[in-house]
Curated annotation (Swiss-Prot):
The keyword Acyltransferase does not apply. It comes from the Bacteria. Antitoxin component of a type II toxin-antitoxin (TA) system. Neutralizes the toxic effect of cognate toxin HipA. Also neutralizes the toxic effect of non-cognate toxin YjjJ. Binds to operator sites with the consensus sequence 5-'TATCCN(8)GGATA-3' to repress the hipBA operon promoter; binding of HipB(2) to DNA induces a 70 degree bend. This forces HipA dimerization, which blocks HipA's active site and thus its toxic action. May play a role in biofilm formation. This is Antitoxin HipB. The lineage of its organism: Bacteria, Pseudomonadati, Pseudomonadota, Gammaproteobacteria, Enterobacterales. It comes from Escherichia coli (strain K12).
């Protein structure tokens, strides 16, 4: 089972998901075909995630057999809040 650090930006999220795709040995084309979207859409997500729709994001997330957990930011440590500010 793969474990990730906390993610604070769309770029970090896209990089983590790209890593999972690569570790599964899938090309962008193979993943795109699996979920019925264009390879260019996968490329756009991995390289410019700020412009990806939530629908596309969740299709990719599901196809990689990943899930997302939300955490209460009020309980974040000062260090994680500082990291979040750096990422955005």
């Amino acid at each position: 089972m793969m474990s990730f650090q906390k993610i604070y930006s769309p770029t970090q999220l896209a990089n983590a998901m790209k890593l999972v795709r690569q570790q599964n040995g899938w090309t962008q084309s193979e993943l795109a075909k699996k979920i019925g979207i264009k390879q260019a859409t996968i490329s756009n997500f991995e390289n410019n995630p700020d412009n990806t729709t939530l629908t596309t994001f969740f299709k990719i997330l599901q196809s990689l057999e990943l899930s997302m957990t939300l955490c209460d930011a009020k309980n974040a440590s000062p260090e994680s809040t500082e990291q979040q500010n750096l990422e955005w």
